[in-house]
């Protein structure tokens, strides 16, 4: 149901209106059950299914912890940068959902309150970076010009949901090198992440950020994110996070696994970067207002 989006997330049942919209008979859908203590025998395999959770939710549990209502979990945010990107943090219910952001059901404990998260998304960032020498980019080269950028080829994700702007530059880039363009794209990704973080932090303070996904290994991105958010940032080096999160939920472990983390410390302070971030926010707001 998390993938098909046919479930009414507030009622935890199939949405009649959505099923009608997509012409799906609601009576052919299976019963929605809790995520844990299922105890469904899989006789052909001589196994018992005890836990069911979506891969992204499982990875979130492995990285952040199982109990989003605990302060140690709700004060953390996860930034995953892969094919696309997302910034996610658990929320204490009832929280008003910030306009435009996604509300995600992490899991539904047996006979207990469902656990939710709020999420901002970046679309197709790997595609934007694919042909550029991003590994050669360094923090010192960021904010070295006044060109602003959007780096989401399939359109801006949450909270904007704007398909009219994808890969977009404020000025011509015809005279720039491939590495300079790559740096602009990394700036745009950093600024989108930092703005999502600002919204989350304003609603409820975030004390720690964890980075995961292939693109999060880029030193330039690690440094730029750390400098723009201004709180401790950790790079998660563990593998198979989805499998670890499923095991954590299955065995009802309250904390995340012993994480292989590396704290991102500021290696070279770029004084220009925060100023450009402030200017980028104004540019983006004006850009989106002119094309409503």
Q: Model segments located where?
A:
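Active-site core segments that coordinate phosphate-bearing ligands/cofactors
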Residues: 6-21, 43-212, 217-292
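Short beta-strand-loop/turn "lid" adjacent to the catalytic site in phosphate-handling enzymes
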Residues: 1-11, 31-43
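A conserved helix-loop-beta module that forms one wall/lid of the active-site cleft
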Residues: 16-37
């Amino acid at each position: 149901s998390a993938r098909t989006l046919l479930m009414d997330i507030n009622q935890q049942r199939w949405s009649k209106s959505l099923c009608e919209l997509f012409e799906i008979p609601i009576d052919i859908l299976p019963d929605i059950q809790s995520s844990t203590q299922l105890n469904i025998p899989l006789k052909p395999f001589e196994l018992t299914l005890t836990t069911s959770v979506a891969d992204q939710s499982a990875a979130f549990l492995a990285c952040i912890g199982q109990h989003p209502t605990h302060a140690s979990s709700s004060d953390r945010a996860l930034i995953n940068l892969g094919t696309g990107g997302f910034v996610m943090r658990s929320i204490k219910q009832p929280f008003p959902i910030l306009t435009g952001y996604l509300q995600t059901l992490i899991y539904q404990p047996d006979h207990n309150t469902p656990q939710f998260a709020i999420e901002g998304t970046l679309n197709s960032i790997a595609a934007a970076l694919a042909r550029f020498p991003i590994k050669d980019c360094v923090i010192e080269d960021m904010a070295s010009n006044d060109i602003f950028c959007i780096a989401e080829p399939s359109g801006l994700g949450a909270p904007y949901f704007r398909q009219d702007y994808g890969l977009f530059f404020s000025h011509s880039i015809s005279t720039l090198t491939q590495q300079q363009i790559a740096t602009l794209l990394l700036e745009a990704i950093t600024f989108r992440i930092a703005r999502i973080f600002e919204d989350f932090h304003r609603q409820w303070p975030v004390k720690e950020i964890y980075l995961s996904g292939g693109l999060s290994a880029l030193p330039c991105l690690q440094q730029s994110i750390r400098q723009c958010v201004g709180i401790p940032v950790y790079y998660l080096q563990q593998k198979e996070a989805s499998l670890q999160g499923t095991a954590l939920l299955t065995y009802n472990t309250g904390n995340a696994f012993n994480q292989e983390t590396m704290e991102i410390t500021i290696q070279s302070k770029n004084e220009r970067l925060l100023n450009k971030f402030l200017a980028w926010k104004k540019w983006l707001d004006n850009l989106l207002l002119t094309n409503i």
